[in-house]
């Protein structure tokens, strides 16, 4: 049994329930035996007395039947209480042992057209999860191997590789993360997120994506992450309408690097990724803004910013950029005018709580009037 003799708060209750089940089960068996003996006893009488004994036997039988039903019900209730007690008192290791032993019994049975491998795989998955919760990593690894073997024998090789890849990619990413090799960690977290999305494990996929966003911001690869998000959204019917928003955010990350060639190449890639993006106002906005930055045309920069902000406020895109931990800081003079060095900056987009500034060929974003406060440091993306 799963209980150690004399140990545990629930041990006396367990013993009482176990004895009750044994007692009621024995009494049910005795009732059946009494029934058989009474029937044999009636056959020994003469016909007249046999009739009287038969009537007496019918009454006894009805009473015995009712008593048997009551005892069986008591035993059933006791079994349920015992199972509930198991659920309360099972430790993680006990449940692991239970699932693993049950899986082994499934594998040992021999029947034609049997689904023992599928049934054992379900039990081994529960054992694996229990071992992981108990942080018994060696036993969890053994459960993984047995699970893979079950899938192989059940002719589900693809499912086996999916399980192994899902596990290994996440663990490899954590290994690179611990060694501060963030570029490699990003690649494996992206792969793990894809597997989780295929299996519709949204929580785990979001955790992997947050890791990608965190390290992408440290490596100044925010645009890469937003492009990846756009690619995933294209494959989802419910999310495909948000693709242009992701690409807009990715393009604005390129703009903030003041690299016109980079944004031009990025726009070409975005159009290859989503052919409908070329006809959107977001694409036109990025192209016009890149041209204004390249020419250092403040008037054009202001007009383009006002035009897009009047139709679709940029706060959504900027808030997504803020998730990356990007710091947007400017230098203000005593009159709260934005300056770079000693040169006053003129020309800014207005409205929507989001403003764009052009400072010496660099695109700077301001949301919720953050620059009305006096900030004395300037940080690029």
Curated annotation (Swiss-Prot):
Quote any Pfam family the record assigns.
SNAP
Entry GO terms, CC: cytosol; plasma membrane
Q: Which InterPro entries match?
A: NSF_attach, TPR-like_helical_dom_sf
Chief location bin:
membrane
Lineage: superkingdom:
Eukaryota
Keyword terms of this UniProt record: ER-Golgi transport, Membrane, Protein transport, Transport
Q: Which GO terms describe its biological process?
A: intracellular protein transport; vesicle-mediated transport
UniProt subcellular location: Membrane
What membrane topology is annotated for this entry? Answer: Peripheral membrane protein
The record's listing under SUPFAM superfamilies reads: TPR-like (SSF48452)
PANTHER family documented for this protein? ALPHA-SOLUBLE NSF ATTACHMENT PROTEIN, SOLUBLE NSF ATTACHMENT PROTEIN SNAP
Q: How does it assemble?
A: Binds to the syntaxin SYP21 and to NSF.
Name the job this protein performs: Required for vesicular transport between the endoplasmic reticulum and the Golgi apparatus. Binds to SNARE complex and then recruits NSF to disassemble it.
Q: Which family is it part of? A: Belongs to the SNAP family.
What's the protein name?
A: Alpha-soluble NSF attachment protein 1
Q: Which organism encodes this protein?
A: Arabidopsis thaliana (Mouse-ear cress)
